[in-house]
Structure formats: structure tokens, C-alpha cells
UniProtKB/Swiss-Prot annotation:
Residues 270-518 are annotated as: LT domain. The gene is mltF. This is Membrane-bound lytic murein transglycosylase F. Residues 1-21 form the signal peptide. GO terms for cellular component: cell outer membrane. The lineage of its organism: Bacteria, Pseudomonadati, Pseudomonadota, Gammaproteobacteria, Enterobacterales. Optimum pH is 6.5-7.0. The keyword Membrane applies.
């Protein structure tokens, strides 16, 4: 997946130019016959979206996601409530605009020339490319030329349909495809994994997140170059909503909120390792059920799944692990650290987990209050890995190089510099393996995303199977029958507890239309 960057310069320039051009329509509160006035009179901003791991999702009824978070802040900016309608596919989203059922579409939609003929785009905030995917072990196409409708299926309203049509007319006359009116891109990727479908096309971000749970999904080839992602609103000559959006995004850019949201949802790294992800998910099935009670017992300020991800990064959940430098155990503690924590046996899993949590809490307590709450854990983990003194150096170096020392996105970019003499020679605490600390935190974030998504996928599958069995055996409750037939369901029973503090999780939902009020 190509590295994603929010287009801050573009947002700022576009906001300035359009604010001037649209100035006559900006006094939103003074007119009763414009779109902003209507939204404020109604008291709610109506946003239509779709369930994807990045765009909009829920845990325990609590919504989150990149587009949801931005939409909620925009509603707050306008002083109204947010009403979210979830649709099954992109085609239904644009139906909402056409029928007057939505003010905005916030769903990771790509900007293209066909859409802007009929709808008003907002500022772009990240970019994606469209990619053809297949299942590992199956035939990998090197070109679209010979694909047929029996092999290639895409979601309705997908932006790539226009690209496919152009390719058919100019380069691949034999190319054909089918549009499945009942499924979205995530469901079609599931069909590829399950062998029901040979190929589909999705955007690079969706694919990257999907692979964290389904590593057997592979990219065959890029269909397009990077394309900007934006929101859409009605194109009706009323520019008040567009002006408000530009002002909002420009303000978010200037105060650093856009950068923090990018880091939260897109900052976990681009590199996908098929073997490593597959090995990790196998360990989730084989090893984690025995360790889960310990992680739950000692996880206090952090989610137990984050603690599990840390332990896997440290030792691959091996209580007997030993490194050449002498660190040992589940949490790979040094002898001195273990002694300071009162640990008598570093290879005892419970002692090691307990000690590791206390040491991490100590690092957390040292992180300055100026660091945003949901980023403090990443600073603490880097300090856990390389020592808090070197974290102080990293923050100081960030400030000296015109970055924000309270922003994890800025600080992590400077971590590798701690091992380069031109930089560490001028720092208080000298040389550090900053590149290792960078990789350490990024790996933990990847394992965390995989773990949460995989557990939710397992829970969904077990629940669906239990419900099916309940239909066959109506005298037995679905829950008890599921636990009897699928013991893994007991392990998963609490896996959907609150997980919104530190980063987004994954849930490849099959829900159709629904509405949420916030």
C-alpha cells in the first residue's frame, strides 16, 4: 500500500481561494434559505456512510472510525447533533443525496470527474489506489486483459467501474465484469477468501486493513494511480455547506487535529508481511486462549488485547524466551528491571506480565500531560523499549527540527535519527537504537489491529453458527449451544469490550441500512 498523506497544503490553499470566492454565502447564521441554515434549524447533520474498518464501525454500540470522527467534529463545529445512516454499498449512498435523505456522504469516497459532474466534493484528506485482489495460492493475473464477468465482480457504485470501462475501450476489448447489487467491497473480499469469487477490486486502504485479519488476501496489480478521497454533498448552487467544510478542514489542519487523526487511523505502517501475520493469527488460536486470563487480570489502564500484542512482540508469547542480551520471559525483562519490580522468576508468565504492566505504567506516568491522551501509550511503549531518557532526547530533537514533541506522528519520524552520529552526538543521552523503537511500536500496533479484528471475526462466525444450530435445536438457547459446540465462543465472550481508547479496531460487518444518533 502506498503511504498515505493528508494533503495539508492543498487544503489550506483551496480553503483560502474558495473562502474568498464564496464569501457572500458564508454568513450562515443570517439567512434562512441556505443549506447550513436548514441543518441548524433541523438541529442535526445527516451523514450517510458504509461499514468499513476505516470509515465507520461500532463496538458495544459505540461508533468510531476516521470518517465518523471527522463528521462528529464537523457536527459539533456547526452546533448540531450528528445523525448517521449506514448503507450497504456506495450506490445507496448517492441515492441518499439524490433523494434528499443526506446532507453529506462521509465514506472514504474517491474524487473523480464523473462524480463531480453531479455532486459537490469537499476537501481531500487522504489518497488511495484501486487494486485487483485474489486469494493466495490461486492464479495471479498480471493484466486485466483476459478477465471475464465470471471471474471479476465489483460492488455497485464503485468508482473503478469508470476506469474499467475506459480500459475496455482503449486497451482490453475482451475485459468484462459483473456488478453485485447486494454486496459491498468488504463482502466481496470475503467471497474471494472463501473461494466463492476469483477476483474483486477494492481500495488500497481497505485491502491493507483486511489483510491484517485475512492474510491470504493478496494484491494482484494496481488498477489506478493514487486518487484523492473526499466527502460529497448535493450540487445545487448553494455553496454554504461547501464553505463551512473548507473552513472546518482548514481549522483542523492548522490546529493539528487532522495530523492526529491521520496518525490514529492510518499511522500503523504500510508494510504487510504475509508470513508474520499468518503466524501471529495461528498463535492467537493455539496459544492465546491459555494466556488471555492473565492479560485480562493485569491489564488496567490499557486494553488487554494491546497488552497481548505487546507480549507477542516481546516474546511471541513464549514464557521461556531469552535474548542474546540477557532479557528473558514473556515480557522480556532485564535482570535489573525484574529485581526492581520484585520479580523472582522472569520465566514465570504471570510474574512477567505483572511486572511488564507495572513497568509500562511507570513509563506512562512520565509522559508529559501535554501529550494527547490517545497517543500517550505510544510514547510509553517507545520508552519501554529504549529507555525513557532516550524518549526525552527524541522529543527534544523533534522540537529542534521544527516538529511537535507532543505528536507521536512527528516524534516517531525522528526516532531513527537517534542512532545517527550527527544527531545523537548533540543529544543529552547519546546513542540509542531509535529505529528499533520505531519498529517495536509499529509492530505492536499491527498485532493489535490483527488481534481485535480476528477475535471479532471469530465471534461473529461462532455466533452465526450457534444461531444456525439453534434453528435446528430450538429447545436449546443459541448461546449455550454455541459454547457447547464451539468452545472458542467462551474464549470470545468478552472480546468485544471497550477498545476505543488507543486505536481503531476492525469489524467487517454485513449490516445493511441503519441509523445512529449522536
Amino acid at each position: 500500500m502506498k503511504k498515505l498523506k493528508i494533503n495539508y497544503l492543498f487544503i489550506g490553499i483551496l480553503a483560502l481561494l474558495l473562502a474568498v470566492a464564496l464569501w457572500p454565502s458564508i454568513p450562515w447564521f443570517g439567512k434562512a434559505d441556505n443549506r447550513i441554515a436548514a441543518i441548524q434549524a433541523r438541529g442535526e447533520l445527516r451523514v450517510s456512510t458504509i461499514h468499513t474498518p476505516l470509515t465507520y464501525n461500532e463496538i458495544n454500540g459505540k461508533p468510531f472510525g476516521l470518517d465518523y470522527e471527522l463528521a462528529k467534529q464537523f457536527a459539533d463545529y456547526l452546533g448540531v447533533k450528528l445523525k448517521v445512516t449506514v448503507r450497504q454499498n456506495i450506490s445507496q449512498l448517492f441515492d441518499d443525496l439524490d433523494n434528499g435523505n443526506a446532507d453529506l456522504l462521509a465514506a472514504g469516497l474517491v474524487y473523480n470527474s464523473e462524480r463531480v459532474k453531479n455532486y459537490q466534493p469537499g476537501p481531500t484528506y487522504y489518497s488511495v489506489s484501486q487494486q485487483l485482489v485474489y486469494k493466495v495460492g490461486q492464479y495471479r493475473p498480471r493484466t486485466l486483459g483476459n478477465l471475464t464477468a465470471e471471474q471479476l465482480t465489483v460492488a455497485p457504485g464503485h468508482v473503478v467501474v469508470n476506469d474499467l470501462q475506459t480500459l475496455k475501450e482503449t486497451k482490453f476489448p475482451e475485459l468484462s465484469w459483473k456488478v453485485d447489487d447486494k454486496k459491498g467491497s468488504a463482502e466481496l473480499m470475503e467471497d474471494v477468501i472463501e473461494g466463492k469469487l476469483d477476483y474483486t477490486i477494492a481500495d488500497s486502504v481497505a485491502i491493507s486493513l483486511f489483510q491484517r485479519v485475512h492474510p491470504e488476501l493478496a494484491v494482484a496489480l494496481d488498477i489506478t494511480d493514487e486518487q484523492p478521497v473526499t466527502w460529497f454533498s448535493p450540487l445545487d448552487g448553494d455553496n454554504t455547506l461547501s464553505a463551512a467544510l473548507l473552513d472546518f478542514f482548514n481549522e483542523m489542519n492548522e490546529d493539528g487535529t487532522l495530523a492526529r487523526i491521520e496518525e490514529k487511523y492510518l499511522g500503523h505502517g504500510d508494510d504487510f508481511d504475509y508470513v508474520d501475520t499468518r503466524t501471529f493469527l495461528r498463535a492467537v488460536d493455539a496459544v492465546l486462549p491459555q494466556l488471555k486470563p492473565l492479560f485480562e487480570k493485569y491489564a488496567e489502564e490499557i486494553d488487554w488485547r494491546l497488552l497481548a500484542a505487546i507480549a507477542y512482540q516481546e516474546s511471541h508469547w513464549d514464557a521461556q524466551a531469552t535474548s542474546p542480551t540477557g532479557v528473558r520471559g514473556m515480557m522480556m525483562l532485564t535482570k535489573n528491571t525484574a529485581q526492581s519490580l520484585g520479580i523472582t522468576d522472569r520465566t514465570d508468565a504471570e510474574q512477567s506480565i505483572s511486572g511488564g504492566v507495572r513497568y509500562l505504567q511507570d513509563m506512562m506516568s512520565k509522559v508529559p500531560e501535554s501529550v494527547p491522551e490517545n497517543e500517550r501509550i505510544w510514547f510509553a511503549l517507545a520508552a519501554y523499549n529504549m529507555g525513557y531518557a532516550h524518549m526525552l532526547d527524541a522529543r527534544a530533537l523533534t522540537a529542534k527540527t521544527k516538529g511537535n514533541p507532543d505528536s507521536w506522528a512527528d516524534v516517531k519520524q525522528r526516532l531513527p535519527l537517534l542512532s545517527q552520529k550527527p544527531y545523537y552526538s548533540k543529544l543529552t543521552y547519546g546513542y540509542a537504537r531509535g529505529h528499533e523503537a520505531y519498529a517495536y511500536v509499529e509492530n505492536i500496533r499491527k498485532y493489535q489491529i490483527s488481534l481485535v479484528g480476528y477475535l471479532q471475526e471469530k465471534e461473529k462466525q461462532a455466533t452465526e453458527a450457534a444461531m444456525q444450530l439453534a434453528q435446528d435445536y430450538p429447545a436449546v438457547s443459541p448461546t449455550e449451544l454455541g459454547k457447547e459446540k464451539f468452545p472458542f465462543l467462551s474464549f470470545l465472550s468478552q472480546s468485544s469490550s471497550n477498545y476505543l481508547t488507543h486505536s481503531p479496531s476492525l469489524l467487517f460487518s454485513r449490516k445493511g441500512s441503519e441509523e445512529k444518533q449522536n
